[in-house]
Amino acid sequence: MQMHASTGCVLMASGLSTRFGSNKLLAPFDGQPLLCWAFAATDTPQLSARIVVTRSAQVQALCKAQGVPVLLHALPGRNDTVRLGLSALLAQHPELTGCMFLPGDQPLLRRATVDQLLTAFAQTQKETERVIFRLGAPAGNGPDPLVGSPVLFSNGFFPELLTLPEGKGGSVLLHKYPTLVHTACIAQPEELADTDTPAALAQLEALVREKG
């Protein structure tokens, strides 16, 4: 049983953006690079530490300019990004009781939502050492919610996160341990939306303008 939650965050920024055509994390969104919205969403005292893991020197430069810790690497797999990020956090903060993983391309995710997820995670950790939390939102056309990132893992999963199968991410553990997965539902499904293509980015920008 955890008495005090100390949670880190790995910002996943190692993708090649093949469908986007260029590095989407540097694409402008509502006045600043897309990745900066992930910085804002995770700028909360509920996180003990965070780190961006990337293969892009340009992303590395942006992180340094914004004062966000960053790790530059050249390894190909999603498992590599998870392992490198978590290892870097644990090297500085071995006391971590949980780690959140967030892709850098969800610009509508709000800090209040991240705080809500972290609070729910910490409350549940008081009762069990092995728990996974993810975000969900109403699907609109069925009983099952949309689910997405970020995803939080308690430290009972750290050994497996550090040894994921080649090319696989943390979703492997969600499928392996479905009874340990909790979904924190939010009202706005667009917070889960990512931007794999320029059209998807433009659609989210239009939504921002529409909501004012």
PLM ranges: what are they?
Residues 9, 50-52, 132-133:
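Hydrophobic/aromatic residues located in beta-strands of well-ordered beta-sheets
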